[in-house]
C-alpha cells in the first residue's frame, strides 16, 4: 500500500525532548505531537476506548500528548490503531534524541483491581516486543475496540521508536482491566526509562 510520512523538525530554539509527526496514507491521516514532561492530553482517533488508553500513556507516562487520527474505520480499526502506533513511535524517537543522560531501563508492575500487568522497557535502539498476554476468553471487543489490536499497536510503537518492550499479563479476569493495565504499565515503564539521570550515555558501546 502507498504510505507517506512527514517528520516535522523541532522549531529553532524549541525545548528538547519533543517530537512531532504527520503521517498520511490512503487509509489514515495521523498527527502526533509529544513532549517528555507532564502536560495535557488531547486525543481524537474515532475510537473512544483507544482514546482512553492513549490518555493513560500521557498521564502515566508523564508526557504531554496530542493525537489526531482519521482512518477508514468503516473497514476496520486496524489501520488507525497501527498507524497511531507508528506515529507515536516516530515522535518518541525524535524526543529521545541521542539518549545521553537517560535512565534507559524502566520497569513497572501495575494493578487494576483483579488484574496485574508487568512491563519492562529498554531504550536499546533495537526494536523488540515480547507480549505475553493470555487475555480473558469470551469477550473480544471493548466499545468497538478489538483487544487484539493492543499487540499490533505496541509492535508499531516498538518498531518505530526502536525500543525493546516486554509485557507480561500475570493475571486478570476483566478484559477492560487487563488491557488498561497493559497501557498503564507500559507508560510507567517508559516514564522510568526516559527519566534523566545525568549526562552520560547509558551504553558501553558509545551509541544507542
UniProtKB/Swiss-Prot annotation:
Might you give the EC number(s) for this enzyme? 4.2.1.19
Q: Does the keyword Lyase apply?
A: yes
- Tell me the enzyme class: lyase
* Swiss-Prot/TrEMBL keywords: Amino-acid biosynthesis, Cytoplasm, Histidine biosynthesis, Lyase
Q: What is the top-level taxon of the source organism?
A: Bacteria
Name of protein: Imidazoleglycerol-phosphate dehydratase
Localization per record: Cytoplasm
Low complexity bias located where? 7-19
What GO MF annotations does this protein's record show?
A: imidazoleglycerol-phosphate dehydratase activity
**Pathway, per UniProt?**
Amino-acid biosynthesis; L-histidine biosynthesis; L-histidine from 5-phospho-alpha-D-ribose 1-diphosphate: step 6/9
Please verify whether the record's keywords include Amino-acid biosynthesis.
yes
Q: Output the InterPro entries linked to this UniProt entry.
A: IGPD_sf, ImidazoleglycerolP_deHydtase, ImidazoleglycerP_deHydtase_CS, Ribosomal_Su5_D2-typ_SF
Any one Gene Ontology cellular component term annotated for this protein: cytoplasm
The organism encoding this protein is Anaeromyxobacter sp. (strain K)
PANTHER family attached to this UniProt entry:
IMIDAZOLEGLYCEROL-PHOSPHATE DEHYDRATASE, IMIDAZOLEGLYCEROL-PHOSPHATE DEHYDRATASE HIS7
The record's listing under NCBIfam families reads:
PRK00951.2-1, PRK00951.2-4
